[in-house]
């Protein structure tokens, strides 16, 4: 994350960092297990088509190249570090896809200091959970065991006690969507069976299920 933020330079002020690479920044429990390492960094940009493509040109000028080995159309690679960078638009018509909670992620982002003079805009924990649940619904295919999106959500539920209060203060539409997604999980017998294997500490499965139940009401 830091290598991408530094490579972007002042361009980073225009994007909001999202996705699995920021999960560790949203964990507030000092005793929580480390989150999974990711191969790439995600960011979203609020811009029209012309501005988005101009921003892509600026990214290329900062030492990034399109990852021609990937079929992910938003993927870049930082040539010096080799770190992958997915730059996504908020508006779905620009690249043909988006996430319905990206606008909320941009609206509620906050600055966070990574140290050594590097500051980024970080999505909120509520936006993280909402976007990840949306992604799981779209590409997860109900595969609990192999979904990094679901794993990321469970890590935040486990490692951020204040998430309950944050969700309670979220917009009604988002709160209802998240609650519905959690309700579908808790009533799924297969999910209950595999939950201990999805988290770093299987002994916390009951606590996580309890929190999921409370969020789904």
Language-model regions: role of each:
Residues 1-217:
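Compositionally biased terminal segments of proteins
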């Amino acid at each position: 994350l830091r290598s991408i933020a530094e490579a972007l330079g002042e361009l980073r002020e225009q994007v909001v960092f999202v996705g699995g690479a920021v999960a560790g920044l949203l964990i507030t429990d000092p005793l929580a297990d480390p989150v999974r390492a990711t191969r790439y960094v995600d960011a979203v940009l609020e811009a029209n088509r012309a501005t988005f493509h101009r921003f892509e040109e600026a990214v290329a000028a900062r030492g990034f190249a399109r990852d021609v080995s990937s079929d992910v159309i938003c993927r870049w690679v930082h040539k010096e570090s080799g770190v992958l960078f997915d730059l996504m638009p908020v508006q779905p018509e620009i690249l043909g896809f988006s996430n319905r909670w990206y606008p909320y992620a941009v609206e509620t982002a906050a600055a966070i200091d990574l140290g050594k003079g590097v500051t980024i805009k970080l999505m909120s924990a509520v936006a993280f959970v909402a976007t990840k649940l949306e992604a799981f619904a779209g590409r997860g295919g109900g595969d609990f065991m192999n979904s990094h999106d679901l794993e990321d959500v469970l890590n935040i539920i486990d490692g951020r006690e204040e998430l309950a209060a944050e969700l309670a203060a979220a917009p009604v539409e988002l709160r209802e969507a998240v609650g519905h997604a959690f309700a579908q999980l808790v009533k799924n017998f297969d999910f209950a069976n595999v939950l201990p294997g999805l988290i770093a500490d299987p002994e916390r499965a009951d606590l996580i299920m309890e929190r999921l139940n409370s969020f789904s009401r």
